[in-house]
Amino acid sequence: LNDLLGELNSSHQGFSSFGDEEEVQYAASTMETGILFTDEDPYKVKSIVARSAADMKEVEILPGDELVKVDGIAVDKHTDRSYYFTHPSLDREVKLTFSRKGQPFEVELHPQSFLGDDLYDAWIDDNRRRVTEKSKGRIAYTCMKNMGTQELEHFIVDMTQELNGKDGLILDLRYNTGGNVHDEVLKFLSQRSYLQWKYRGGQLTTQGNFTPADKPIVLLINEQSLSDAEMTSAGFKALKLGKIIGNETYHWIIFTSGAGLVDGSFVRLPSWGCYTLDGKDIEATGVTPDIKVINTFEDKINGRDPQVDKAVEEVLSEIKK
């Protein structure tokens, strides 16, 4: 049925049930540790992902350490590493033995079932460092991973901390998976100064307290900015809040309702289409950037980010005007 729905080429549709046909014959869990290994030697540590299971241990795992045992079983360097970390269910604990300069040491970890959020956060940390270094601290950087209420709260707190004392802003919606808080984000970004006030003997300060639109703003998007990230991007462009840099969005923006069927299954129904003020269907057109910059696979594996670099360049040029 999902294959049939796919032929309609309309996003956010779906069918799910809880019958026997949904059960799989075999399930497996990968025990994620947060340890990244080198490409040249699949058992030699390259780095540790911040805030992951391996980052929480008192015994520090360092780049160059070599994994020699998993739960007491010696690893075979000619065996795919995933063999030792894939089980029918997630283990509560895994014991890893490493060698450092010929000396063995053990680390016990509580493995994770998913590392994606930690990798995303590490990517955000790297982007923020890049922006801070290239702008010499003049530009604030914030990223929204989705358009949910929790991420909205994080965005507002981040803005109150990051934007103060900065001359410009980069908002990153790349890889954003959507939600429904576009209106709140756009309202916050649209705030401009309208008055000044001061306490007796003090200095003049502007009202309101948070006025992002007083400063140059650049929005980053890419081919995996989808759903409500596309609504936010389209609104950002319509309100002329700043330049959009990156690649065209995903073309995946419809709001749905749903219905339960008599057998307990559930179907999602497209209900609200999303259109620009001149009537263009955003699902059909996506949102195109003002300045197109594509990050290649080669950029990624070499630690480059031309989209962020261009955003910094653009904000700095606006600051100088």
Where are these regions (language model features)?
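In a subset of proteins, long, contiguous C-terminal domains/tails are tracked
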Residues: 11, 164-166, 196, 275-321
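Peptidyl-prolyl cis-trans isomerase
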Residues: 60
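C-terminal structured "cap/appendage" subdomains that terminate the fold
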Residues: 241-245, 251-300
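Short, well-structured alpha-helical segments that form the helix of a local strand-helix-strand
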Residues: 1-4, 308
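Cleft-lining beta-strand/loop regions that shape enzyme active-site pockets
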Residues: 18-19, 23, 44-57, 68, ...
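Conserved catalytic motifs of ABC-family nucleotide-binding domains
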Residues: 64
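PDZ/PDZ-like peptide-tail recognition elements
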Residues: 3, 7-51, 55-57
